[in-house]
Amino acid sequence: MKRSVNAWAVGADYGFEETFAKVKAAGFEAIELNLDADGAHALTMETTAADLQKIVEISKKFELPVSGISTSIGGNIGSADEAERQAAVDVVKKQLFLAKHLGASAILAVPGAGNTPWGEAHEICIEAYRSLTPVIEDTGILVGMEHVWNGFFLSPRDLAYTVDEIGSDFVGVYFDIANCADRSKSEDWITFLGERIKRVHIKNFNRKSVFEFAFPLLFEEGTIDWVPVMAALRKIGYEGPLTAEFGAPEGDPSENLIKSADAIRRIQCL
């Protein structure tokens, strides 16, 4: 399991070269980039193959491969609104394009419903991804669906059902260790989802009470029990990257990056 980190941890004041340099110096072995709105190291819907070639050269320079392509836009692929749904499909296609050119093996997808009722939205999402399956399989890029707090995937059973109904070996789960830790055990989700898990976000969580919680940095105090989490990942045979995801601080992000990479090293040994 390689140590990876999402570029959001560096901050928008730094360009691609500085971002790769800081991530490499901190001790990470890979980096996850993002399809976003405009930003210093953001990929956008307008990013071209020529733009990506420059990033490939930076990646080679620092010997830091791109582990995946995440995104903060275009999640409503389960919407009954055709325009919303098509915009989400276009985002997935763009992520696949970016991943292919950057040598990344996976993208992160966040399905959503818009204003569509939950059950209907899931069936629309499944049909949308079935229609995308030939494109996905042609690229050979893995698509991992992430459970976020948007009310779409409420349990590991919802995730498993959606993935299984789509029915492609290239569509699975991008599991975020902390996103389910508010009311359940992360290791239980890992065990239930099993080999559907294609990629992992390693993130901390601190549940102080039913109504009070936080997402501390990996090297800070949290309530996730990393021993059973790592045991569950090993049991399902997961060997992909552990990608840290956290926001950038004000000022230089180097200290947070170094401490986070060290925290992953320690967690890997559990």
Placement of each model-derived feature along the sequence:
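N-terminal pre-domain/capping segments
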Residues: 1-101, 130, 168, 195, ...
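Hydrophobic faces of well-ordered beta-strands that scaffold small-molecule active sites
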Residues: 3-7, 31-33, 66-71, 107-109, ...
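Active-site beta-loop-alpha junctions enriched in small/polar residues
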Residues: 6-10, 34-38, 71-74, 112, ...
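Active-site acidic/histidine proton-transfer and metal-coordination neighborhood
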Residues: 17-18, 53, 57-65, 75-172, ...
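Acidic/histidine-rich catalytic cores of soluble enzymes
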Residues: 30-34, 130-223
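Glycine/Thr-rich phosphate-binding loops of Rossmann-like dinucleotide-binding domains
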Residues: 41, 117, 210, 252
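A short, acidic, amphipathic alpha-helical segment used as a generic capping/interface helix at domain edges
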Residues: 223-235
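Long hydrophobic alpha-helical segments typical of transmembrane helices together
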Residues: 229, 238-253, 257
